[in-house]
Amino acid sequence: MSPTTCTLRKHKTNRKPRTPFTTSQLLALERKFRQKQYLSIAERAEFSSSLNLTETQVKIWFQNRRAKAKRLQEAELEKLKMAAKPMLPSGFSLPFPINSPLQAASIYSASYPFHRPVLPIPPVGLYATPVGYGMYHLS
């Protein structure tokens, strides 16, 4: 099927084919991206000519790489959120939202010296009923 009659993909017939970057070009692009995520027009012109690429190819590569970096950062943040969530049974929720691992840590540590929850102490003695047993559990 020719590009002009293709109904699945609607694009210009004079579209340039996908550029297969060489390994050395990719390494240089990644190195430059680590240094600076946004290039000025002059930097892009100089950099693209040094790699034998067009300015548009470099511009699009940087756009795609920024999108990838954002996606990876959001995935990492989601992992941290999942790791920071307490393992609670389903249907059980906290009375306050925890939006970040740092917030969760600060909630627990900020109240530590002053508002520690006090658990009831079971009675101890000769006639004390063991914890978990009541008069209804005796047979």
Curated annotation (Swiss-Prot):
Record keywords: Transcription included? yes
**Chief location bin:** nucleus
**InterPro entries per the UniProt record, alphabetical:** HD, HD_metazoa, Homeobox_CS, Homeodomain-like_sf, HTH_motif, Msh_Homeobox_Regulators
Keyword Secreted: yes or no? no
Protein name per UniProt: Homeobox protein MSX-2
* GO biological process terms on file: activation of meiosis; anterior/posterior pattern specification; BMP signaling pathway; bone morphogenesis; bone trabecula formation; branching involved in mammary gland duct morphogenesis; cartilage development; cell surface receptor signaling pathway involved in heart development
Name the UniProt key words of this record, in alphabetical order: Developmental protein, DNA-binding, Homeobox, Nucleus, Osteogenesis, Repressor, Transcription, Transcription regulation
List the CDD domains. homeodomain (cd00086)
Give the organism, scientific name: Rattus norvegicus
Which residues mediate DNA binding here?
A: 14-73
Role according to the record: Acts as a transcriptional regulator in bone development. Represses the ALPL promoter activity and antagonizes the stimulatory effect of DLX5 on ALPL expression during osteoblast differentiation. Probable morphogenetic role. May play a role in limb-pattern formation. In osteoblasts, suppresses transcription driven by the osteocalcin FGF response element (OCFRE). Binds to the homeodomain-response element of the ALPL promoter.
